[in-house]
């Protein structure tokens, strides 16, 4: 029996695509293996958001070729879209598919390796990522995504709800809505729709316990939307915002058309309406022209904000973007600033988690390891409890006895 594995780099949208492919391949009799060094086909869904992402993809191709030389390697995703010839010329790579050829990728694998009889379904993830949107209509000066993903495109309501109902029947209790720019959802549909309209349908699905949103752009969040999310028990109290920076000068250089005052308003109103929510943000350090004063503004803003964690990224020039030719901050300064923000994030997150010591919370089993259950709560607390025998995606109730 032929087998496949999928390695996704980068965003949750890539993860959602891989999740969907895994289900389809299994329904056509191809066995899922988690170990890429043991599978017949290795599909790489690549990322090109940073130079480091590019390097990670190329290193993985080399590792697979060295440790699993008989595997057929397929490369797709954003790095393949940006530089397809790089992989087409690589003798280690069997085939390359651009982002708009991912349906062809699935067809190729099924026609080459599929059977009429499905294999027993093996969950690819403990929570089901569901892609509802792709692409972006904006051109932030640092971002290559619009070039490799195209303009915003939304899935229709009926297709999404049908997919979610099928996942619930398979036993999934939580879905994670993903997209390149979730807040643009529905604007391109006819008639036009919106993310709140879609959520209003999804929350009515029986036996669906949790809906988690991946990343939200504060530029498109109003009080009505925040009120809706905060007031619905099925929508997880977990907000992840694409902030990037808070200094007005740097925000303008990034082409993001928002102010730090608007950021503050959104964050504080979200905290007011959802006091127990986990609130995170993406932050870019070292953007060209970032002065000490700009960084001090960023640090002070984050320190005073209700955010409970942040993902810190070093600025990485991307070919074809408006900022690519600008001189960035020197490496030593950038590393120092990044370290300061990561330490601040660690302290803020510990402070947030300590609030829930001795609390009893529900959650979803992510995995079982060494006779312990790893559980994720709706507000993004990762809890380890003694126990075994619970399959992934099960609902459990836990008491948090200590915080580390």
Model feature map: region roles:
Residues 52-60, 153, 249-255:
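Glycine/threonine-rich flexible loop motifs
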Residues 325-404:
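Terminal RNA-binding accessory module
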Residues 73-74, 82-83, 169-292:
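Conserved SAM/AdoMet-binding glycine-rich loop
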Residues 125-158:
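Canonical Radical SAM [4Fe-4S] cluster-binding loop centered on the CxxxCxxC motif
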Residues 11, 185-203, 207, 315-347:
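Radical SAM enzyme [4Fe-4S]-AdoMet core and its adjacent flexible, acidic
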Residues 149-176:
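Conserved alpha-helical substructure of the radical SAM core
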Residues 1-108:
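Cofactor-cradling patches in redox/metallo enzymes
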Residues 97-130:
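N-terminal [4Fe-4S]-dependent radical SAM core
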């Amino acid at each position: 029996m032929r087998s496949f594995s999928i390695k996704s780099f980068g965003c949750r949208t890539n993860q959602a695509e891989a999740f969907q492919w895994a289900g389809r391949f299994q329904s056509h009799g191809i066995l899922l293996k988690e170990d890429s060094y043991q599978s017949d086909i290795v599909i790489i869904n690549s990322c090109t958001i940073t130079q480091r992402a590019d390097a990670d993809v190329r290193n993985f191709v080399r590792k697979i070729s060295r440790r699993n030389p008989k595997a057929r390697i397929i490369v797709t995703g954003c790095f393949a879209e940006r530089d397809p010839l790089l992989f087409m010329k690589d003798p280690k790579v069997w085939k390359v598919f651009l982002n708009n050829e991912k349906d062809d990728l699935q067809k190729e694998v099924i026609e080459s390796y599929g059977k009429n009889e499905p294999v027993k379904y093996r969950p690819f993830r403990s929570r089901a990522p569901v892609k509802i949107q792709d692409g972006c209509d904006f051109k932030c000066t640092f971002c290559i995504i619009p070039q490799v993903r195209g303009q915003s495109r939304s899935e229709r309501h009926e297709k999404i709800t049908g997919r979610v109902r099928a996942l619930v029947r398979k036993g999934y209790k939580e879905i994670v809505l993903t997209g390149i720019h979730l807040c643009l959802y529905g604007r391109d549909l006819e008639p036009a729709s919106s993310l709140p309209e879609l959520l209003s349908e999804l929350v009515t699905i029986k036996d669906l316990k949790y809906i988690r949103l991946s990343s939200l752009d504060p530029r498109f969040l109003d009080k009505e939307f925040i009120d809706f999310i905060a007031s619905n028990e099925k929508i997880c109290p977990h907000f992840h915002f694409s902030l990037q920076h808070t200094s007005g000068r740097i925000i303008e250089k990034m082409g993001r058309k928002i102010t730090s005052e608007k950021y503050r308003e959104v964050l504080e109103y979200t905290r007011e309406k959802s006091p127990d929510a986990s609130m995170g943000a993406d932050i870019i350090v070292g953007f060209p022209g970032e002065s000490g004063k700009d960084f001090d503004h960023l640090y002070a803003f984050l320190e005073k904000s209700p955010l409970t964690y942040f993902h810190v990224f070093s600025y990485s020039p991307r070919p074809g973007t408006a900022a690519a030719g600008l001189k960035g901050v020197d490496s030593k300064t950038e590393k120092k600033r990044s370290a300061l923000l990561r330490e601040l994030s660690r302290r803020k997150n510990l402070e947030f988690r300590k609030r829930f010591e001795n609390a009893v919370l529900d959650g979803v089993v992510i995995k079982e390891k060494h006779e312990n259950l790893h559980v994720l709560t709706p507000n993004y607390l990762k809890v380890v409890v003694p126990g075994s025998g619970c399959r992934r995606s099960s609902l459990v109730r836990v008491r948090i006895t200590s915080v580390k």
